[in-house]
């Protein structure tokens, strides 16, 4: 059954985000009500250094089915933005992709660590930078079809140098590039990492909306 969402321009003011106000409600509130699924059984089948995997038995209405679920503590991803509108990205080898990828700096949250603290820590550890300002731009699920990992995206400005502190298995190259060039690399297919594409596009959209289409000095 298809449910038609209301037109943004008619039903309410536009807001660049997953949920947007529509007469005091969100767009998702207009979709037909669906019963909350219930987990009736869950078995852990793998425990790793970063994540665990369970097989969950789920009841949704009259249907009962199983899903493999990756349990992950969540991550912070950062776009470090300099006054000349360049951003700092990292080039690193990703074995599942069997190639080097250009990515926004990011990392898994440590035990009981807030996303903002995690973002500040990763920025300093990976790039050797400290941010005078960390602004939360968005939060999103990475791959909700099988993984519960959530990412928090921060825009880092008012940057100053600190000391890089990489883990033994972290071999990265820091790449400084203009935001406009990074956006062109997305269009050309040269940036292939989903979180980085999301982060750069949301950063560009945020800056343009605040400055009448022009990238600001920060």
Outline where the language-model segments fall.
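Conserved Nudix-box catalytic region and its N-terminal flanking loop in Nudix hydrolases
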Residues: 36, 70-72, 76-121, 138, ...
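Active-site-adjacent beta-strand/loop module that shapes the phosphate/pyrophosphate-binding cleft
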Residues: 52-61, 143-162
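Short, Lys/Arg-enriched N-terminal segments with co-localized hydrophobic residues
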Residues: 14, 19-33
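Extreme N-terminal tail/first-helix region
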Residues: 30-47
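Acidic, metal-coordinating catalytic segment for phosphate/diphosphate chemistry
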Residues: 42-77, 83
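Compositionally biased, intrinsically disordered low-complexity segments enriched in Pro/Arg/Gln/His
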Residues: 6-11
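A short coil-to-beta-strand element that immediately follows conserved catalytic motifs
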Residues: 130-137
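Nudix hydrolase/Nudix homology domain
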Residues: 31, 100, 144, 152, ...
């Amino acid at each position: 059954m298809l449910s038609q969402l209301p037109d943004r321009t008619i039903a309410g003011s536009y807001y660049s985000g997953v949920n947007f106000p529509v007469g005091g409600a969100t767009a998702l509130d207009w979709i037909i009500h669906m019963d909350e699924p219930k987990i009736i059984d869950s078995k852990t089948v793998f425990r790793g250094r970063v994540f665990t995997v369970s097989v969950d038995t789920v009841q949704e209405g009259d249907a009962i089915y199983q899903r493999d679920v990756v349990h992950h503590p969540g991550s912070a991803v950062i776009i470090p933005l300099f006054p000349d509108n360049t951003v700092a990205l990292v080039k690193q080898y990703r074995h599942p992709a069997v190639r080097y990828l250009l990515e926004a700096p990011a990392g898994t949250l440590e035990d009981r660590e807030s996303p903002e603290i995690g973002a500040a820590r990763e920025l300093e550890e990976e790039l050797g930078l400290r941010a005078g300002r960390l602004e939360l731009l968005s939060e999103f699920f990475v791959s909700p079809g099988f993984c519960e990992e959530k990412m928090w995206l921060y825009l880092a400005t008012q940057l100053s140098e600190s000391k890089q502190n990489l883990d033994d298995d972290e071999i990265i190259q820091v790449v400084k590039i203009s935001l406009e060039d990074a956006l062109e690399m997305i269009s050309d297919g040269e940036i292939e990492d989903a979180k980085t594409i999301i982060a750069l596009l949301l950063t560009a959209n945020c800056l343009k909306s605040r400055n009448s289409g022009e990238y600001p000095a920060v």
